[in-house]
């Protein structure tokens, strides 16, 4: 049976002139969707555009939260697919999506290892520069005291990942989204807790997710993924 695969990304709160351009589609074995609040964003052939309405109490980071909602809840927005490949808008799919979903094997989800941090508490400390400090402290307190999340859980890179549309993956992403809505918008920090609480099966993708400079130019020396940026293993 043919896999039904959706490649999903989102872009909000950015001037279209400054946004990293979407890539031209290389593989026709998936459907491609971008959720955006930009009416005049240039969309290459083959992409399906969906309107995104950022509306959160956290006005400073509402665009981030809106995009994270798409990332985490693709199974609600696009329910008729077997698999979802998420990537931030600076990435592109450089391998046949059918091969990417095969890398899941028996797992519900698969992520790249985080290139720097080795625990969610360490990542949380780094998030202070890009988040409301009080919300950082509240997140740590709730995850540790209320949910007893161990300090040494691994941190995953969430720039790009692949997941199934099944009960375990959907529950994990639902909890992940609930944590994000109530706590920090830094989704790398709350993902380990969602995995721990739901016991979803998670695999590791080879390589690392892509990195970008502040001007949205991709830095080749920081780009080490083997499958999402078109390089070969």
Regions found by a protein language model. Name each.
Residues 8, 33, 48-50, 85-87, ...:
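Hydrophobic/aromatic beta-strand patches that form the interior of the parallel beta-sheet core
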Residues 1-67, 77-80, 182-186, 197-200, ...:
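N-terminal anchoring/stem segment of glycosyltransferases
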Residues 3, 28, 71, 156-159:
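Residues that flank catalytic or metal-binding motifs in active/ligand-binding sites
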Residues 133-232:
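Catalytic core and acceptor-binding pocket of nucleotide-sugar-dependent glycosyltransferases
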Residues 8-11, 35-37, 87-89, 95, ...:
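Short His-Asn-centered micro-motif
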Residues 72-125:
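GT-A fold catalytic core of metal-dependent nucleotide-sugar glycosyltransferases
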Residues 108-147, 151-152:
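Acidic, glycine-rich loop-and-strand cores that form catalytic or ligand-binding grooves
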């Amino acid at each position: 049976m043919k896999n039904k695969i959706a490649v999903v990304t989102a872009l909000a709160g950015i001037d279209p002139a400054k946004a990293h351009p979407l890539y031209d589609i290389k593989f026709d074995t998936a459907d491609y969707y971008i959720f955006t609040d930009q009416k005049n964003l240039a969309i290459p052939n083959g992409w399906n555009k969906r309107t995104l309405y950022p509306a959160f109490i956290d006005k400073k980071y509402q665009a981030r939260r809106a995009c994270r909602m798409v990332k985490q809840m693709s199974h609600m927005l696009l329910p008729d697919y077997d698999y979802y490949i998420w990537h931030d808008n600076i990435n592109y799919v450089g391998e046949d999506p059918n091969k990417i979903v095969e890398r899941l094997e028996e797992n519900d989800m698969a992520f790249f290892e985080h290139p720097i941090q080795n625990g969610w508490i360490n990542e949380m400390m780094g998030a202070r520069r890009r988040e409301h400090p009080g919300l950082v402290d509240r997140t740590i307190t709730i995850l540790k005291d209320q949910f007893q999340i161990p300090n040494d859980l691994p941190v995953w890179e969430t720039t790009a990942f692949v997941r199934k549309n099944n009960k375990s993956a959907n529950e994990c992403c639902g909890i992940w989204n609930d944590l994000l809505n109530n706590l920090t918008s830094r989704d790398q920090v709350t993902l380990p807790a969602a995995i721990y609480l739901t016991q979803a099966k998670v695999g590791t993708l080879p390589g690392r997710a892509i990195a970008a400079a502040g001007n949205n130019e991709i830095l080749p020396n920081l780009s080490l993924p083997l499958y999402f940026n078109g390089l070969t293993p």
